[in-house]
Swiss-Prot record:
Catalytic activity: N-formimidoyl-L-glutamate + H2O = formamide + L-glutamate
Family that this chain belongs to: Belongs to the arginase family.
Pathway: Amino-acid degradation; L-histidine degradation into L-glutamate; L-glutamate from N-formimidoyl-L-glutamate (hydrolase route): step 1/1
Residues binding Mn(2+) 2, per UniProt: D155, H157, D241, D243
The protein's Enzyme Commission number: 3.5.3.8
Protein name: Formimidoylglutamase
Keyword Transcription regulation recorded: no
Originating gene: hutG
GO molecular function per UniProt: agmatinase activity; formimidoylglutamase activity; manganese ion binding
Role, per record: Catalyzes the conversion of N-formimidoyl-L-glutamate to L-glutamate and formamide.
Pfam families (alphabetical): Arginase
Organism of provenance: Salmonella paratyphi A (strain AKU_12601)
Amino acid sequence: MTQWYPASPALWQGRDDSIEAPDARRLFQAITRSEAFSPENWQQKIALMGFACDEGVKRNAGRPGAAGGPDALRKALANMASHQGHERLVDLGNWVAPTPDLEGAQQALRDAVSRCLRAGMRTLVLGGGHETAFGHGAGVLDAFAQESVGIINLDAHLDLRQTDRATSGTPFRQLAQLCDAQSRAFHYACFGVSRAANTQALWREAQWRNVTVVEDLDCHDALAQMTQFIDKVDKIYLTIDLDVLPVWEMPAVSAPAALGVPLIQVLRLIDPVCRSGKLQAADLVEFNPRFDEDGAAARVAARLGWQIAHWWR
């Protein structure tokens, strides 16, 4: 059974510069850490949650270790400077999945996300493998059952694989099937896709599903496509698989990208998403601290989380 645990206060530590000025604060001083999973007490805040699960990565024959991602990313975030928006962050702890119950873990995350959104919070989830996306996305669909939900994925992979059980490579096929079951449109856009990392069958599935696909080679000039997608939906779920970044910026993932989309381009793409007023949920997935020798990759990932919270409108 998937268990919930509050985040350890030891994760939120950093340098105290407050003697210099009242606004010389860092995230560890701005964030609120909750000892209970009580989203109803935190309306209009951003729920920071961890999904400590990499069973989907294991099933997908990837490199395990992403279950340690949430706490590693908290440590990297803690000492970053606090600016506008960061005071809204409330750490609502980790969902920890016992191997091999991926389906139970995804259901627990789904219920938690739906509860947060219905309570008036927004959700920022730290994975975990990209199996995070099915639980997170399903929770968003549940919470906004009468509205059109757009799923924006920055990823080298389409993650539309067809297998006999859920993996880190199946979340968007699962979400498509959930939309089918609910008789609602499946709005999915994937930016940063590597043609070399996706089979022809996956491209065919994406075409059949009317997925908006932008390859890694074209992301330098994709703002118009991003804006068009934002305009056609009511609510947005943003998911960032860190393997969208080039290996020289992000080696600490299951499948590092030989080409990838540089961090500066990723930030430019998500800027209008965060400022759109439609973003309800976001996550960072696939960070694997086992392959981060000096903490540099954690800082890259943390900058994305920091920027999302700062820009979020």
